[in-house]
Amino acid sequence: MIVLLVVYVLYWTSVRADRAMDGEIDHLQDRWATGAVTAGAQPAPEPRRYEPGASFAIMYIPRFGADWAKPVLQGTAPGTLKKGLGHYSRTARLGATGNFAVAGHRRTYGDPFEDFPQLRPGDAVVLTDGTTWFTYRVVRRPYRTLPTDTGVIDPVPRASGFRRPGRYLTLTTCEPEWGHSHRLIAWAHLDATQSVTQGKPKALHS
């Protein structure tokens, strides 16, 4: 029974999660392609609300591989994180002033942040919401802290080195690799934006 449980945790949960993440990406791309989001359109006075548990963006991290792409969903509930990365609901919107903070599993459920410790200063974290590409740049190696250290996702995140308001990104995952006693944190700042009508950003061509 123990062997079967290990197989389920290590293999089957990841297979199901990979399918779920691919499905979320397909859903987003289909919605964007059919005009639910109009490329290059002027932003609405009231930005569209992120619906709990629903995907709204796709994240790319070249450091993790040319094919690495994960959906970003609203919220960090366990069921949400089985389908992709989760946006901390009390943090800023994508690209906005403040701190856009995102959580993801390091192991199990697709292992989206398995290679998190490999992040280095200058690495690109690229996201799109169907109209705009947002390129963030990592500012330091991953930082280890406790799960209770919620200051790391503040608008000006604690211990990040940032001293004033800006357009920031925080990524969080579990530490150690097969545990959850601590957290690994990566911070980035918004480096560039461009319309999807201009094609993919340089960071995805390097």
Task: Please give the residue ranges for each predicted region.
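Extracytoplasmic/periplasmic soluble domains downstream of a signal peptide or transmembrane helix
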Residues: 98-100, 106-206
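N-terminal membrane-targeting segments
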Residues: 1-28
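Short beta-strand/loop turn elements enriched in aromatics
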Residues: 77-100, 134-136
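Short connector loops at helix/strand junctions that flank enzyme active sites
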Residues: 53-54, 67, 95-97, 120
